[in-house]
Each structure stands twice: as C-alpha cells, then as structure tokens.
Amino acid sequence: MSDSFNLPLRPLTEKRERPDPLPVEIAQINAQYGSFRDVTEDSLRAKIEADKNKDPWFDKEENDNASADEDTTERLDQLYKRRAAITQFALQAHMEAMFALDFVSLLLSKHTPRQAEMSMSAYLKQVAPLGSLNSEIVNPPPKPESAARDTKNVSRGWRLQNFNSAASKLLDSATRLEAEVASETRYWDEVLAVKEKGWKVSRLPRERQALGVQYGFLEATPIFRDRGLAALRRTNDGSLILDKGLIPLKARTVRVRVRSRGQITGCSKNQPASDNTESIESRILQARDTVYEEELFHELVREARILGSQGVTTRQNLVQFPVSEEQEVLLDLIDSDQISPENDVVSSNEHAVVADALAHAIRILLAYAHRQNLRRRTQLPTPLTPKRRQTPEYQLLRPVMAYLQHSSHVRWLESLLNDINQILKSAGITCDFTATPFSSLSLRRTISGLPKVEALVQEFLLPYESTFSAQLVTPQSSFRVKVRTNVTTPPLGTHYEISVNMPQYPDVRPPNRIGLQDEAASILTHFVLLDILTAITHAKGSSVKGIKQETGHLLTWQAAYPHNGELLALSSTGQHKKMKVSLSRHELTVRVYSIRGIDGFGKPAVDKTPAMRSQTWKCDGTPDQPNLMDFIAEVSKE
Amino acid sequence: MHELLLFASVPAHQHHELLQQLAGLTAMQPRHRLERRLIFKAYRKPGLINTRVGASQDLQGNEMQRLNKMLNGGMFYTQVVGPVSEADFGAQSSAASSGDPDAPMSGTDTGTNFEYHPYSYENQPWKLEFRDIPEAGTRSAVTTRLMASASLPKGDITTPMNAWGYSFVTEYVVEGDVFILNDIVIYLHRVLHYPAESSGSHEPRRQLPPFQQMSPLEKTGSYVLQASIAVQDGGNQEMMKTASQHLFGLREQLKSAVRLEQADRLSLDTRAK
C-alpha cells in the first residue's frame, strides 16, 4: 500500500511520420472558402463563433417552428400522411424481411429441407423447387493494399477512441470512489465514536443494510420501546444523521406546575439543553430524553384515567390533581424550547421546590416501573391462556398524590396540636406532644433479594403513616393519633385513627376511623377538654398549699356534665358555683357563675345571673395572665 | 396443561457463545439453575385392584369408574425436582468434622450419621413433575406432551412418594441457564451424574458431593437447548397453534446458531413397563 504506482490509462499517441499534408489542406481550403484572399483572421473567427453558437439540431427546429405555424387541419392532414408513410415503411420492411427469410430458407433447403420448408412462403414453394439454390465458399479477391491500410487505420482509430473513453471512465470512477471512501471513512469514524460512548449500535431489524443506534428503554411499553431505535444514516458528505423516521425532532418534556388559589406558584425547571445541539451524541441524548418524557406522560395519562374517582382530571395534554382545597398540581407535556408560555405567568416561586421534587419523583417512579417490568418479564411465564394479561398502570401519580395529601394532613394536625399546646402553655398547663411524621418510612430497611434502589423506592409505594402522641395533664392520660394515607388499595384517602387512654372516662372511645379534618379536630379538642376538667377536679390537692393559710377551705369541683365542659362546686353554705370550660383551637375560656340552688332535675338554674368571673387564654400568650390553676384556686374560695 | 418443546444439541465449545447470543436475544442475563432430580417409578400396590368384571347388574358409579381407570391405567415414571445452589455441593466435608448434637435430626434416618450443615436435606423444597409420552401422530413439527407440576412437602420425600405408590429409582443433577423470551422458556442445560456410588442406595442422597466431582452424562460436555412453552388448555387448538408458532419463530431466529427440532418421541417415553 505504501508505494503506490501509477498506471497509465490513456493510450500513448505516437506522432507518426506523415507525408506533408500541406498541399492537401491548401486544396481543401480552396474548395471550402474559395480564394485565399477572402480568408482573413476576422472572418475565420466569426465563423468559429457562429459554429459554436449553432445548435446541431438547429435546422430541424427551424422546420418544426415553421410547421407549428400551420393550422390544425393541415397538421392533422400531415399527421395522417406521416402515419401512412410510417405504415408504408413498416410494410416495406416487413416485405423485405420476408424476402430475406425466403431467400435464406431457399438457401437452407438444400441441406435441411424439412426445417427450411416451414419458414418458406407459399409462393416461393410454388415457383422454386426445394434445394434449387446452393452456396459455396469462394475466396474473395485480395483487397488492394490501400483498402487494407484504411481498414487498419479506422480500426486503430476506433480502438484509440475506445481506450480513451475507457480511461476517462476509469479515472472518473476513481475520483468518485475516492470521495466515496472519504465520506465512508468519516461515517464509520462517527459511528465508532458513537459506539465508544457506550451506545448500542446494531443493524436495523426491518432494513438490514442500515445501522441503527439503540437509545430507548427496553422495559418501556412496546410502542415506546420500539421508538428507542433510530437509523444512523450518512449524508452525501459522510456526516452522520439520526433518522427517527416520522417522529418529530423536537425535544419534549413533562412540566410540573403547582397552582394555589388560581395562581401558578411553582414550575419545575427544565434541564438546560446541551450547548452543542449539533453533535450526534447530543442528538441521541435528546432523542432518548424525549422518548422517556413522552412515555412518562403517556403513563401519567393512563394512570390518571383510573384515578378519576380521586379528583384527577385529564385534558388533551394536561393531567391535573388536587392536593388540598386551594392547591392543585398540573402536569403537561411541552416542547422544551417553550419554557414559559405567555398565557399563564408564574406569579411566584413559592412552590418551585415542590414542583421540582415532583418532577424528579415521577421520573424516578417510572424508572422503578421499568425495573419492575424487567423483573416480571424474566419470571417464569404462566401457561398460555386465551386471555391476555393486561399490564397494570404504573404507580406514578398515586405515590406522589399520597405523599402530598399525607404531608398536608400531617402539617395540619401538627399545627392544630401546636396551637392547643400554646394555649395550654399560656394557661400554665404543660402537655407533652410528640410528632413523628412519616413514621412508616424506614429507609434503612433492606429487603433481601432486592437491590438497594428498588427497596428505597418501594418504601414510598407503601401506605404512609404518621403518628402523634401526647401525654396529657393528668397522669396516665394520653392519646395517640395515627394518620394513614392509602392511595393504591382501598380504603383510599387519608384517615385518622385515634386511640385514647383516659382512666377517668373509661367508656369514652373515639370512632374507629375518622376521615374529616374537622371531625378529628373536634374529637381531639374534646379529649383535651375532658383532660383539663379532670385536672381541675384533681386540682385541690396540689394547688391548695399556697392558699391554704388565707382561706381555710376551698370548694371542690365536680364534673357535672363533662362533655359540655361544666363543673359544679357545691358548698355547704348553699352558695354553689358552676364553672364552664370551653376549649377551641384559638382559645381556652373558663367562666364561673354562682348559682343559688339546684332545680328538680339537678340542673342549676343559673342563666339569669351574670358571670362572676371569666378568663380567656389565647395562644399568643399574654404574659401577665394568671395561670389556670391559680385562677381555679382563686374562684374556689368561698 | 400441555407443553410444546423443541430441542437442539449444543456442543461444549459453542456453549459460551450461545449463552451470549441468547442473552442478547432475550435481553436478560442468564439465570443459573441447579436442580436435583429424583426419578420415581410407579408400582401397583397389591390388593388395590378390585375390578368386578362381568357383573352387569353391578352398575358402577361414575366415580368408581374413574377411580378404576386411574388405578389400572398406565404407570409412569415421574420426576421430583428440587432446586439447589452451588454452595450446597460438597457441604458434607464440614459436616463430618463438626458433630452438632442440637442439629435437627430426622427420626427416620438411622444408617448415615447425618448432621447439620449448610445443605439441609430436611429443608429441601421439592416439586413433582409429571410428563406424559409425547403425543403421537401430530403433523406439527414440535413435540407436544401432557404435563403437570405440583409442589411437594419439604424434606424427606421418599416416604410420601412411597405412600402414593412410587418407588425411588435414581437421581441426577441438571445444571443450566434459563432465559425467558415472552412465553418461551429457554433452558440450556446438561445432565450431571454423581460420582460412582459405592453401594446401590435406594434413598435420595442426604449430602451432595463436591461439585467438581460431578461428571456430565455426555462425556464431551455438550449441552441441550430446550425451548418450551406451556399451554393451559391443550384442547384449545387456537392456543396450541399460537404456541407452536411462537416456537417456530424462535427456531427461525436461532437458525444461524442452532437447529431446534422435534425430539424423538420414544426417547421421551415416561411409561413404566
């Protein structure tokens, strides 16, 4: 290869000794142009120019132009005439061919009469008997020397011409091949570069000559799996193009937005497009991302359809689900260059983090679903039955919704308990609230036989559970709230399970499962109220010490109607007192009335007398307020 | 349940290459599988046959007829298959030295000094696999046979099998890799023999010899490629056709690598003479 050698392709034209051609040429010029006097350089140049411009078919065209002027009847006439002429020529040709056939047949009939007879015309058979013509080879007379030389020259010229054309054809194809080799080299270099990056390059299944690159996901739904293969085609100059067939080239992506009170308050960020969009690598990456995003959206819509009962709505290109009363999440598939559409402006970035987290979460969940598909695919298959197995919807929206719903409930409950705690604290009561949100998640748990990643994601597919517990004022009283959110299996939604331990009211049991926030709130405040009442009835022993010296004896409170928050203190002097305690999320109020007697039904007839004392504690905690026990002691004085 | 099969013989030198090709075709990593296979033979228990031939007045109930048919029908060899792992092999060497008296001993076993070791015969799960002789006279180019599988209790299997009228014949090990392609199970395997046993034991082994001592049945070490597909309802012609078409599709795809073909019917005869 190193030492290239040159092969002369064009025939060498040797200059031959010729007889001086001048006299011949002079004679020719005289014949062509007349006297030499008329032949000037100018006239010759003009002639050359004229020859150059003249079209070889010019004469004919002139005729045609002339005939075009004739009108249609004449043209029709001419057409018929010409046709007749053509027919005549054809007939003549036929006749001549028949004559030739007859001649040859007659000639052959000497040797093979049977065969020759078949091709003879009837007329010839009549007039000439078979085998009446013979042929024999005669030696032609020797050709004159000049004729032989002419033939030789002509054939030599022909050969030269053929060599020349062959040589130029070869040279042409050599240059073409060279260009082809260069572009082919470039193509293969680029294909190799793609392969070295780790992409799977293979033959296309349908088009066996073409190469393709596999960038899709093997475990995706078949339509998206098949789209993960694109042909690597060569342009004329050898650069690589990614041919995805009919699929549009645009990059698309799923966008997550959070809308609160009709305003977009968060939008997931697009990953920045790679800077050199022209390189084949980035094209492949973009194609891969797009196919992933489109599959993601497809699966989101598929899942959203079965979640109609849970408030998920779908439009043509939008999936929407509510998180709470005033917040909802919108998912749509957009072109990635269309970053912020003009119609809905992002009013704040309050929930941008949430939107981003959701965007990441659904993608992780899709990848998890792909892994599950692989797992399912490589299990031993069940026997064939006519019923086809339906692929279940992936869990993409459900875990996300469950998480959002759960955390909103947990946050609400936490704030409720905090408020109550604040109120109690300002009233001088200490309770002990502990909250463990998402207590069901244990990220350190490992499931044998599952890779770490899958075990991690699986945690988030289980029902969420958070627990809250509180030690109340009275010893041994406590309650415990479990918040469970379940989106995949019924019972759907979030519910509260409250368990109470109150020795004073052993028959008080909360309902099994509470679904509404208000209900849960009222039950919890009720328990705290009952507990405060218990504390007040027990208060005497503990708080008495400071005041004992002054008064001598205090009233004892008894819970008359604990569920209404009413306490009664009976005094030996007949000056009974009644206390009404009410607790809400915002305040704790204690009112003390004095009553004169108890009516026949044991109901104190109070209502006409104005409130004697009243005290309210709010969660902001005014500093110079007496604490509840002091207040009780105060009002307990007779 | 019916099973449709195609077989091919794979020489040892092609094994690695074919594994790669199959991994590419099925887009999955091979699942290595080691199985102990025990062969049991059915025998007729004396005294169970009570055919009352000729008594036309004695109308047999449907149930009775079925029972008789079952009892007097053909006798078959069946296999009991238990998955094992490579670590289970050769575990006996450690067992011989460590005499652990607290190990769960099996009461029935008295002859061998069986001790606790990584391979526990008592916890060996088993599966009963019944395969009929392939159907005769089918025009299709696949082997079709009736099959049934059932899970069996763990541990010592000879006692229940004896109670059901099966006696232990012999055992061997199958080593191979499994691939799944849609509904087709591709099993590239070979049969391994235990090292020559000293005494003709009529019990399944309680320990396994070191894996290196196992010798392939086929001396050249060649493998068998088995492509199978199970059909729930063998009477459903449509499904049987679909299944065999799937197999033919696979045969076409593997044409350049191996030649999958129907097995000789009589070589898969499981009837006990």
UniProtKB/Swiss-Prot annotation, chain A:
Keywords noted in UniProt: Activator, Nucleus, Transcription, Transcription regulation
Any one GO molecular-function label of the UniProt entry: transcription coregulator activity
Top-level lineage group: Eukaryota
Gene3D superfamilies: 6.10.250.2620
InterPro entries: Mediator_Med17
Region (Disordered): 1-21
Subcellular location: Nucleus
Keyword Nucleus: yes
BP-aspect Gene Ontology terms: regulation of transcription by RNA polymerase II
UniProt GO cellular component terms: core mediator complex; mediator complex
Record's function text: Component of the Mediator complex, a coactivator involved in the regulated transcription of nearly all RNA polymerase II-dependent genes. Mediator functions as a bridge to convey information from gene-specific regulatory proteins to the basal RNA polymerase II transcription machinery. Mediator is recruited to promoters by direct interactions with regulatory proteins and serves as a scaffold for the assembly of a functional preinitiation complex with RNA polymerase II and the general transcription factors.
PANTHER family: MEDIATOR OF RNA POLYMERASE II TRANSCRIPTION SUBUNIT 17
Family of the protein in this entry: Belongs to the Mediator complex subunit 17 family.
Subunit organization: Component of the Mediator complex.
Protein name, UniProt field: Mediator of RNA polymerase II transcription subunit 17
Source organism per UniProt: Aspergillus oryzae (strain ATCC 42149 / RIB 40) (Yellow koji mold)
Gene: srb4
From Swiss-Prot, chain B:
Ranges where the record places region Disordered: 90-114
Localisation per UniProt entry: Nucleus
Key words of the record: Activator, Nucleus, Transcription, Transcription regulation
Biased composition annotated in UniProt, kind: Low complexity: 90-106
GO BP term (any one): regulation of transcription by RNA polymerase II
PANTHER family: MEDIATOR OF RNA POLYMERASE II TRANSCRIPTION SUBUNIT 18 (PTHR13321:SF2), MEDIATOR OF RNA POLYMERASE II TRANSCRIPTION, SUBUNIT 18 (PTHR13321)
Protein name, entry field: Mediator of RNA polymerase II transcription subunit 18
Organism: Aspergillus oryzae (strain ATCC 42149 / RIB 40)
